[in-house]
Amino acid sequence: MTTASPFPNLQNQQFMNLTTYRKTGVPVTTPVWFAQVDDKLYVYTQANSGKVKRVRNNGKVEVSPCTRSGKPLGPTQPALAHILPLEEGKRVDTLLTNKYGLLKRIISFVAKLRGSTPAYLEIRPA
């Protein structure tokens, strides 16, 4: 028996809008790459990004399919996000590289050259 995906609107999508919330409650929506494994979504970003700061303060997020530029392609779904320990990042990097290929490798290389510290978000259905 196959279990239905908890994120059906994100099936076969390349980008999703991730909406996080400032301490004031104001939403901030950002288009991001993601990988889905079972009932979880994984996102790569930089440790000093606004997304990470906002998730650290409030793990309630919303996700929806979108274009590369963030134009919504479907309904928004509530979810819960948390920051993964850095040692779990290799697995997430592999998932994202499998999905996005050379472009993901280039982005990771440039980030490493800049001395950026990566951060990885795990997102589950709310």
Question: What is the role of each PLM region?
Answer:
Residues 48-120, 124:
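Short, structured beta-strand-loop surface elements
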Residues 2-5, 29-35, 81-86, 126:
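Short flexible/disordered coil segments
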